[in-house]
Amino acid sequence: MLDVAIIGCGVVGAAAAYELSHYPLHVAVLEAENDVADGTTKANSAILHAGYDPETGTQMARLNVQGVALAKKICARLDVPYRQCGSLVLALSQAELPHLQKLYANGVANGVPGIRLLTAEETLAMEPQLAPTVAGALFAPSAAIVSPWEFALAMAEVAVRNGVELYRSTPVTNIEKIDGGWQLTTPNGSFAARYVVNAAGLNAQAIHEMAAPHTFTLEPTRGEYYLLDKSEGNRVNHVIFQCPNENGKGVLVAPTVHGNLLVGPNAQPVAGDDTACTADGLAFVAAAARRSVPGIRFGESIRNFAGVRANVDTGDFVIGEADGAPGFIDLAGMKSPGLSSAPAVAKEVTKILAAHNDLPEPKTNYKDGRTRVRFKELPPEQKAELIAKNPAYGRVICRCETITEGEILDALQSEIPAVSIDGVKRRCNAGMGRCQGGFCGPRVLELISKTLGIDPLDVLQDKAGTNVLLCETKTGRGCNHG
């Protein structure tokens, strides 16, 4: 029997796995998709929020401030792209200045470090590209930008290195109470566990109701984004917010850790995991963003995408043992600031185990730390040394991002190997540039096929069913599709 079964390996599930892997526990992660970080974690604003927005006294407020501090340390330790650039919440008119005062007071009460109110002149001195109508801003220096999928992947990889078992393409279809724990049914067999951690993201309500009575309702909310070329990457230096409202933190404009500019999201209620982009939604995002930063050149957009966040009717994170289901631990409703809070949320799990006297002393032989090769960032002499040891690093496959064959092979041979073209992209950035894989995609597909020993026709773009190739056209194999 497992000590702990974690359902879901987005950033919250990965953080829970990383935290629990520090202890001599038998832990398994059951992920429904074929890769980690393949839901909300891969499609969000990539912001580690400072923590001034959540209502004081909520779990969100406490865990946001704790989590962003923990995330900074984890990113440094695990070689995750991270930049503490700070954020500005703008008052775009005199009428919005009182709202900044409220956010400031809330931030002070939440323990957000270093926040202060700026005049219009101070704000424009920091960000000259802002709209001239700016009346002031709230500056939060602890806010940061991160690569969210790399954050989750790094924590999951180190957890696996330290004994956590990861089962991909293993959705949980039923949960039953058994003596001493829980029985989880999946298409790949059953798992018995003393504790279950429900980190299933958009599916957390359904998973909860397999084990306990209905106590919360998730409200899936789609957010649409523009990702702009690196030519727009220096448009702003901080994360730029507008005053938040009942729909969230509003449309932001932010640099990314990879040098692009990110603009979005809107907030549209949807049924389930509907990640379609719409003309109306994107038009709204562009118009709203221009209120803050009027000079954005949306013609430099290289990709639109949408993510669905798990808003919840409780107004706060759902964390703790479910009523009437001892040992079943919910980590649900992880809307913003879920990414920021994830490392602190994970520590809530160990607190629950400790309260039951089920948390042993930490391992003394823990294997922490992680690095990966970023060839283009190396000085010339290190590049030469690397190529001499492994010529694959001398063959550039993705010209937009200068990603080498060696880096792609690393992604396919890592502790959690990529199994799709997008999986490679999330691990080493191949296909992340201006052409969005138009040039390197076929070569990446070829490397996946050769390295993993699978038919090119079976190579996926991302999730199950996203086969890139339908048939061979010149060898007589023919197409059987309609």
Residue ranges and their predicted role:
Residues L2-A28:
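N-terminal Rossmann-like FAD-binding beta1-loop-alpha1 element of flavoenzymes
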Residues A15, I175-G180, L184-G264, Q268-T278, ...:
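Flavin-dependent oxidoreductases
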Residues H22-K42:
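Glycine-rich FAD pyrophosphate-binding loop
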Residues A46-M126, A135, G250-V251:
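Dinucleotide-binding Rossmann-like beta1-alpha1 core, especially the glycine-rich loop
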Residues R62-V65, L90-H99, L138-E157, T275-D280, ...:
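Short beta-strand to alpha-helix junction loop
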Residues L138-Y195:
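Helical element adjacent to the flavin cofactor pocket in flavoenzyme catalytic cores
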Residues G248, V257-H258, D273-V396, I403-I416, ...:
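C-terminal catalytic lobe of FAD-dependent flavoproteins
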Residues T404-S414, G438-P456:
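Iron-sulfur (Fe-S) cluster-binding segments and ferredoxin-like electron-carrier domains
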